[in-house]
């Protein structure tokens, strides 16, 4: 190459450099622009190396040496820029794809959770829930503070449904839920908010958040759920049904089994109602104002399992063994039902877990089995296998740990006094929002139980290299086999179980652990011993 040709070559390289620069400005517009920029950068680099590979006429010229080094630096920089922008664009596309997949997954889970048959009714019911703050309540409770957390959830009565079964009434009583104020009578209220003043962050004292239910119209329909194969329960159920019909003029709905038993006993009970198929059972929440359970905690679990969506308030009478969720004494059922039917009364909102099984053969995470709602816990154990359970656990896509032991318990706070407690988990107040993560006989001295916030999603997966299978059970029933590659997804359901309180949520909880578990029961120390 002659010196006369050198300016033309340099001019061509500048043109190539300008072309690369113009392509760099268009990289963010899409993957095609990214590819074009990358190709242009590679061609520019190749041309620069071809030019530098030729023997210059005056190799000792300092300007040519400096120009050669500058061109090499430019070529490397252009290559790094093109590669960096291409990688950034690819990463952005991957995050966008993950976001769209997650949103589609959540929508699919919501649709499956509601059930295709009851979807229209649930949407109608959700549209009737309005959040209000009455002016009278705000002025009477909060004074002049200006901010009030005394919002109430008002449930308007749904209109009659022409598709409903003729065996069930079509109108439901309306009610309101409101926060309690610790029984304060002085007009002062402790707000639940975080303030920022003068550079300091402070949390105001919270009220005890007791939830009160007040009927706006009289309850018309009561559903009875009873413990089977118990003569004392059967006798009490017949007595309560007769009393509600004769003294309260209330419609009574019972299970098909109970209906058959009562009608066999006496034709007087011809007025009771029941359901014939699963379609009618799915619509119970739109007809029933109140649920009365006669039995123990297992009866409450069974009653909750009948409702895959909203659950009416539950009044649980103790006719079982321990009774953590059954505070009402059966001997005083008249007074108890009078107080509940007249209102207002305290309730405990007990969260439920929504569980999905994703099989390894599924094409994507949208292909899940029918969701299962649990009130106490979901247990994953090794079943009859002689090998340790091997589970990989994730929390919102973050790796938590690998479980090697007899299994794992994922529990609600209501279930903290059940299997989780026996496995070493802590007892937690049922209105504390959280998910308990409790191992079963872990093969590790440092594996302690966890309590996670209620908004997380847990994923428990049996890895492909696991030596054995695992079994999942939901509130002690509906066991499902989890083969290597299968996963279980757990999150808090939007539909809690509201249980009526005898006194209030905290008093009932403390009474249950004292009377049911004899918590911290020991002989008191003698006062006449040695002293300091």
UniProtKB/Swiss-Prot annotation:
Region of interest: Disordered: 1-32
GO process annotations (BP): NAD metabolic process; NADP biosynthetic process
Signal peptide: none
UniProt KW Kinase keyword: yes
EC supergroup of this enzyme: transferase
Alphabetized InterPro entries for the sequence: ATP-NAD_kinase_N, ATP-NAD_kinase_PpnK-typ_C, NAD/diacylglycerol_kinase_sf, NADK
Reaction catalysis annotation: NAD(+) + ATP = ADP + NADP(+) + H(+)
Gene Ontology MF annotations: ATP binding; NAD+ kinase activity
Composition-biased stretches (Basic and acidic residues): 1-26
Keyword entries, A-Z: ATP-binding, Kinase, NAD, NADP, Nucleotide-binding, Transferase
Keyword Signal: no
Record-linked HAMAP family: NAD_kinase (MF_00361)
Entry similarity comment: Belongs to the NAD kinase family.
Protein name stated in the entry: Probable NAD kinase 1
Organism of derivation: Oryza sativa subsp. japonica
């Amino acid at each position: 190459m002659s010196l006369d040709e050198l300016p033309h070559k340099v001019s061509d390289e500048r043109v190539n450099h300008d072309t690369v620069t113009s392509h760099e400005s268009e990289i963010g517009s899409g993957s095609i622009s990214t590819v074009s920029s990358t190709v242009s950068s590679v061609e520019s680099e190749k041309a620069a190396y071809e030019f530098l590979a030729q023997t210059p006429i005056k190799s000792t010229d300092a300007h040519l040496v400096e120009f050669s080094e500058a061109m090499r630096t430019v070529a490397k920089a252009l290559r790094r820029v093109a590669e960096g922008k291409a990688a950034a664009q690819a990463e952005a596309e991957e995050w966008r794809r993950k976001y769209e997949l997650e949103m589609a997954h959540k929508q699919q889970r919501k649709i499956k959770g509601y059930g295709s048959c009851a979807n229209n009714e649930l949407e109608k019911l959700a549209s009737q829930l309005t959040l209000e703050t009455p002016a009278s309540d705000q002025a009477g409770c909060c004074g002049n503070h200006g901010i009030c957390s005394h919002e109430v959830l008002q449930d308007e009565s749904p209109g009659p449904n022409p598709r409903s079964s003729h065996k069930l009434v079509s109108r439901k009583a309306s009610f309101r839920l409101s926060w309690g104020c610790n029984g304060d009578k002085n007009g002062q209220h402790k707000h639940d908010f975080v303030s920022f003043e003068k550079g300091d962050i402070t949390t105001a004292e919270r009220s005890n958040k007791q939830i009160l239910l007040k009927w706006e119209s009289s309850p018309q329909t009561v559903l009875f759920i009873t413990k089977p194969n118990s003569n004392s329960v059967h006798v009490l159920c017949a007595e309560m049904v007769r009393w509600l019909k004769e003294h309260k003029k209330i419609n009574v709905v019972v299970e098909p089994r109970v209906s058959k038993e009562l009608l066999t006993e006496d034709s007087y009970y011809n007025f009771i109602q029941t359901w014939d198929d699963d379609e009618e059972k799915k619509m119970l929440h739109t007809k029933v104002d109140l649920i009365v359970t006669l039995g123990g905690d297992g009866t409450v679990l069974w009653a909750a399992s009948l409702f895959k969506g909203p659950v009416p308030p539950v009044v649980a009478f103790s006719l079982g063994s321990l009774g953590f969720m059954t505070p009402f004494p059966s001997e005083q059922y008249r007074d108890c039902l009078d107080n509940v039917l007249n209102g207002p009364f305290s309730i405990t909102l007990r969260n439920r877990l929504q569980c999905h099984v994703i099989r390894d053969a599924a094409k994507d995470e949208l292909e899940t089995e029918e969701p299962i709602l649990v009130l106490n816990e979901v247990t994953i154990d090794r079943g009859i296998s002689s090998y340790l359970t091997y589970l990989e656990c994730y929390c919102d896509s973050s790796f938590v740990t690998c479980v090697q032991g007899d299994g794992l318990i994922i529990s609600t706070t209501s279930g903290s006094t059940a299997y989780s407690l026996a496995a070493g988990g802590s007892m937690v107040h049922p209105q504390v929002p959280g998910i308990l993560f409790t191992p079963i006989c872990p093969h590790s001295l440092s594996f302690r139980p966890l309590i996670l916030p209620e908004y997380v999603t847990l994923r428990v997966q049996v890895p492909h290299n696991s030596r054995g299978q695992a079994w999942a059970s939901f509130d002690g029933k509906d066991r499902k086999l989890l083969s290597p590659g299968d996963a279980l997804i757990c999150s808090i359901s939007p539909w809690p179980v509201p249980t009526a309180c005898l006194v209030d949520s905290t008093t009932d909880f403390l009474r249950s652990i004292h009377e049911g578990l004899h918590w911290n029961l020991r002989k008191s120390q003698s006062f006449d011993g040695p002293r300091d």
